[in-house]
Amino acid sequence: MSQPESTSQDQLPTWVESSLFKGMLRGIERETLRMQSNGFLSQGSHPKALGSALTHPHITTDYSEALMEFITPPKASIQETLDYLKDIHAVAHKHLENGEKLWPLSMPCMLDDSDESIRLAQYGTSNIGLFKTLYRRGLGVRYGRRMQTISGVHYNLSFPDQLFEALQHNEKDEALKALSAQDYRSHRYLGLIRNFIRLTPLVMFLVGASPSVCKCFMTGREHQLLPLLKGTLYLPFATALRMGRFGYQNSAQKELGIHYNNLPDYLNGLQKAVKTSYKSFSRLGLNDADGEPLQINDHVLQIENEYYSLVRPKQVPQEGETPSGALANRGIGYVELRAVDVNPYSPIGIDENTAGFLEVLALYCLFTESPELLEKEQDVIDKNQTEVVNRGRAPNATIVENGKSYFIEDWSRTYLDKMQAFAELLDHSYETQIYSKALQIMQARINEVDETLSAKMIEDTVEYGGTWSFGSYLAQKHAEAYEQHQLSKKASAYFKEVAQASLDKQEQLEQDTTQSFEEYLSQFR
């Protein structure tokens, strides 16, 4: 990536001032499995005291009934967001049943040999509830249920209107100056997304935290992983196996050619995918032997959400809008950064160092020139990601960029140096040192790879005697942190009220019987 003409290598444009960043918003989504006291995946239902997983705004489920998802609202600072996430964890932990705990690793706790023991998330008997469960059943028959037990952290980030206005005002390209505010904002967010994809190996190297897996996760799969200890497989220099071929992937999607070079093409690609049949999925059948639906349809994507990517353009949908409909109508409103492993050492799965680093990186990606991302370059990026996932901490691990090969430490250091000015700018905007401190922590990980999360995890997994023992130790430690967390009376009352309101909302949805589920489903087939 080259720098914009208006900046020197390590310098921001002269017109940039800290007030432009007032109004940035961020939100976090954190996934975590409920684990039984024996270390196996929970077979219990989502605790009713936490409300309805269908309609609760902050505590829901992802693929499995046991895979919880905690969602903060957009907040004005990193600290406020992390504090809110702590509240959610404390509430969820309080209502876990039968001695269950929250599993602290991205890669799952113990699974038995049967996929059927990975229960699909249940959302009640309304059409939308049944539809959500069927979507998950379809994912299971397409890709297997094991893959869907992996947890991650999604970091949502938006920049304020005045920043885009200033960027557009200072554009040299008259065509870009002439765009509507909405179209220009989408144009800049897409530039951010392309650059973030280019720099994803940096995220995997510095905050990757899935270098090993429980042996049970690989049941029935071919692999080249090595035994670390009894019951644990790993690669010696791996950083983020979750992001590699053992993690979530969809080979059918690779054929789509969906890209982030402009919004209309991205949306057209998505629309085509949700309407085009795919032979492998057609062969699975739409219904099982008993006539029960197996998948929503046989299309490349059952619904838009099935499209998996490391970063997503997002817009808050209004009632009745699809994600792509919201983007088409109002442009990109924020980005969702999805290449982030759960930090097992944090009770809430992420700390302020990772949050600060991601925000500086995103701002750097927004300001830096971002040419179109074409297939040839994407192939190189894919190879870079594979290198970092499998052997990012190896002494001779390399990154290829613009036809040249670099040692990963040198490559990473170059980009962190370029980001320094952006960290200082954000520190000034927020009257904090969070951002500069985050870069210092990441710099220390580059200088000494044994300081990376993935290296520490290997060391601790050996010390505690395996994935399960290490994860169980952390789960207990984090449970104590949740119990010690002081929830304010206001927050306590709010979560109680929201839980009940979500149950009432689900019941209301279930009373609407004007359309059978078969009729509802036919719209998508």
Regions found by a protein language model. Name each.
Residues A328-N329, V335-D427:
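Substrate-recognition/cap regions that form aromatic- and gly/pro-loop-enriched pockets
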Residues H428-R525:
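Extended, compositionally biased alpha-helical segments that mediate assembly or anchoring
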Residues P13-T14, G129-R142, T149, S158-L327, ...:
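Loop-rich catalytic cores of soluble enzymes, especially ATP-dependent carboxylate-amine ligases
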Residues M24, F131, M147-S151, R188, ...:
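Secondary-structure capping and boundary motifs in well-ordered enzyme cores
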Residues E31, M147-P160, Y334-D341:
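Histidine-centered divalent-metal-coordination microenvironment in nucleic-acid enzymes
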Residues P108-C109, C214-F217, Q378-V388, Y435-A444:
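A glycine-rich phosphate-binding loop feature that marks nucleotide/adenosyl-phosphate handling sites
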Residues S2-G140, M147-V153, Y184-R194, R198-P201:
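Terminal catalytic/cofactor-binding subdomain
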Residues Q43-S45, L82, D115-E116, L167-Q168, ...:
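Short conserved micro-motifs at the rims of enzyme active sites and ligand-binding pockets
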